[in-house]
Design a protein with these regions (language model features):
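N-terminal non-catalytic cap/leader segment that marks the start of a structured domain
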Residues: 1-95
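Glycine-enriched loop-and-adjacent helix/strand subsegments that border the catalytic/binding cleft
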Residues: 70-197
Length: 198
């Protein structure tokens, strides 16, 4: 499934894109696309719906982030070999984790706010894994069972803040709107992540 949140900022409704590309309203079946909606049992119910019977949404509404009410926005630094080389850094032996503020989450085509004194605004296209089942101390073999789906994320950074004003990743990456995602989440069952070449 391709799940979306559509409508004016702060008034988004849940929806899905059917196989023909038609936007369909899910409001009668789920209040919003949050952690509860992305839990395995809820996703199974949504997958069982006949998309053709859902109300069609006319026009081309704005798409918001395909998930709301997140508890954490976790990212991994230097996660691509080419990016590590580009920055002149070695491949880290352990992943570099950092958090982006939840307020950095925004829709895929929403304006990105440039902070005052910004000098080196940068962006990186990433693939985001949306966790649908609470996960803690999960084995590598079981990890993908906690993923609800995937979407595109634009990891926006202010490199001047990040590298020249204290070396803090949070300072350079957590400004409001610095995490546009979407336009939709594709559920895990429809993505062969091992073939994604990322």
């Amino acid at each position: 499934m391709k799940l979306v949140r559509y409508g004016a900022l702060g008034q988004e409704k849940p929806g899905l894109i059917d196989k023909s590309g038609q936007l369909r309203d899910l409001s009668a079946h789920v209040k919003d696309l949050n952690g509860e909606a992305y839990a395995p049992a809820s996703l199974a119910k949504l997958a069982g719906l006949d998309a053709a019977k859902l109300p069609a949404v006319d026009g081309k509404p704005r798409f918001g982030a395909p998930v709301t009410g997140i508890s954490k926005f976790v990212a991994i630094g230097l996660n691509y070999v080419d990016h590590a080389k580009e920055t002149g850094n070695p491949i880290p032996p352990e992943p570099i984790f950092f958090l982006k503020a939840n307020t950095s989450l925004s829709g895929p085509n929403d304006p990105v706010e440039m902070p005052r004194e910004s000098k080196k605004l940068d962006w990186e296209v990433e693939i985001a894994a949306i966790i649908g089942a609470r996960a803690k101390y999960v084995s590598e073999a079981d990890a993908l069972n906690h993923v609800a789906g995937y979407c595109i994320c634009n990891d926006v950074s202010e490199r001047y803040f990040q590298t020249e004003r204290g070396g803090q990743w949070t300072k350079g990456k957590s400004h409001d709107t610095f995490g546009p995602v979407g336009p939709w989440l594709v559920t895990r069952d429809e993505v062969e992540i091992g073939r994604a070449h990322v």
